[in-house]
Amino acid sequence: MSLNDDATFWRNARQHLVRYGGTFEPMIIERAKGSFVYDADGRAILDFTSGQMSAVLGHCHPEIVSVIGEYAGKLDHLFSGMLSRPVVDLATRLANITPPGLDRALLLSTGAESNEAAIRMAKLVTGKYEIVGFAQSWHGMTGAAASATYSAGRKGVGPAAVGSFAIPAPFTYRPRFERNGAYDYLAELDYAFDLIDRQSSGNLAAFIAEPILSSGGIIELPDGYMAALKRKCEARGMLLILDEAQTGVGRTGTMFACQRDGVTPDILTLSKTLGAGLPLAAIVTSAAIEERAHELGYLFYTTHVSDPLPAAVGLRVLDVVQRDGLVARANVMGDRLRRGLLDLMERFDCIGDVRGRGLLLGVEIVKDRRTKEPADGLGAKITRECMNLGLSMNIVQLPGMGGVFRIAPPLTVSEDEIDLGLSLLGQAIERAL
């Protein structure tokens, strides 16, 4: 009998856990190390999503374990009006490594919280309240962040915040605007903002965007799009908020994804990867915006704002990423992963597209590669076969597209682990077809 079949465990889970989306895997995870998690039977499962797209250093990295132990023993939590060295040091480090002009940081706990703080700041500083995002976005499950999230969770909970607008994200695999046989995503952006201008009451405060929309199906903003988006914002007195929860801290082959585009947002939000799986988030903005927000009485007082222990973790994460060259490694290992996925694409017609950047890649599963008809159900079947073989994969499927695997192994992943994951994925596809 499998130790995962613990009747008491599953009875208690059914009776006492609130279900918050999706279904639970039918196994009990007992420990994790590096690129693997281990169930109650000791079976190793290769984690190709870094937990919740967060554990960029792998699970239980020894230096992170060490710093947690150190600060749990001497300085864990403080009254929010007190400061500690890890907090000031992390804010200083973030100012030094983010694009020039982003000089002041607020340290928080989760991605939703950081986006909430950013949107609140944008509304206060601009004196306006309308927020625009992408129709395939995910920015969090709290108030303003949920109102700016369009990929899921909008039904059954009453109205979103007044002034919430969405435009389609540019999707090169499934283009909507074509000119002379080519996708004209800048014309699409022009048209989208024309519609926004017609709906706006003149109170456009900010646009919030992910450089690569992860929950939206690994939709990468094409070259030139982010710069054009920034110009749209500037022309309307809007702030540009970039949510780099998943793309930040080296995952895409630059420290921050916006650096590829040479675009500096007005507010940058970080979470997931900043704490490498621990609850740490931040917003980073300019001195001018922070000064104006402070003058206007900006308030974002939370229980765990400026907590020293997670700040110390964030510092150590950045130390390891920079010391071990993990940003460059994301490019090298990402190229290996991409080549392997393209090889699988040659073997299996159900793979319609391979996309993404660095170690954040997407694989879209289709019924017909020529027509790009979505293959409803096949992606979920492949996912189940992956888990049966010992590979943890995550798939998302929005209306109008096939299931998309979001592949995001740790930046510390080895060549052998990349190759193992590719082999298991190939076997899973064979079983599912």
From Swiss-Prot:
The record's listing under PANTHER family reads: ALANINE--GLYOXYLATE AMINOTRANSFERASE 2-LIKE, PTHR45688
**Per its UniProt record, what Pfam families does this chain match?**
Aminotran_3
The EC number(s) this enzyme carries: 4.1.1.64
| Gene name of the encoded protein | dgdA
Keyword Lyase assigned to the entry: answer is: yes
Q: Look up the record and name the cofactor or cofactors this protein needs.
A: pyridoxal 5'-phosphate
Where on the chain is N6-(pyridoxal phosphate)lysine found, per UniProt? Answer: 272
Q: Could you list this entry's UniProt keywords, alphabetically sorted.
A: Decarboxylase, Lyase, Pyridoxal phosphate
How would you summarize the oligomeric state and partners of this protein? Homotetramer.
Reaction catalysed by this enzyme? 2,2-dialkylglycine + pyruvate + H(+) = dialkyl ketone + L-alanine + CO2
Which EC class does it fall in? lyase
Key word Lyase present? yes
User: Could you tell me which InterPro entries the record lists for this protein?
Assistant: Aminotrans_3, Aminotrans_3_PPA_site, PyrdxlP-dep_Trfase, PyrdxlP-dep_Trfase_major, PyrdxlP-dep_Trfase_small
Q: Which family does it belong to?
A: Belongs to the class-III pyridoxal-phosphate-dependent aminotransferase family.
One further remark on this entry is: The enzyme may have evolved to use the rare dialkylglycines of cosmic origin, or it may be part of a metabolic pathway for breaking down cytotoxic peptides and the constituent amino acids.
Q: Which organism is it from?
A: Burkholderia cepacia (Pseudomonas cepacia)
Q: Which domain of life is it from?
A: Bacteria
Q: What is this protein called?
A: 2,2-dialkylglycine decarboxylase
Q: What does this protein do?
A: The dialkylglycine decarboxylase is of interest because it normally catalyzes both decarboxylation and amino transfer. It may be more properly described as a decarboxylating aminotransferase rather than an aminotransferring decarboxylase.
Q: Which GO terms describe its molecular function?
A: 2,2-dialkylglycine decarboxylase (pyruvate) activity; pyridoxal phosphate binding; transaminase activity
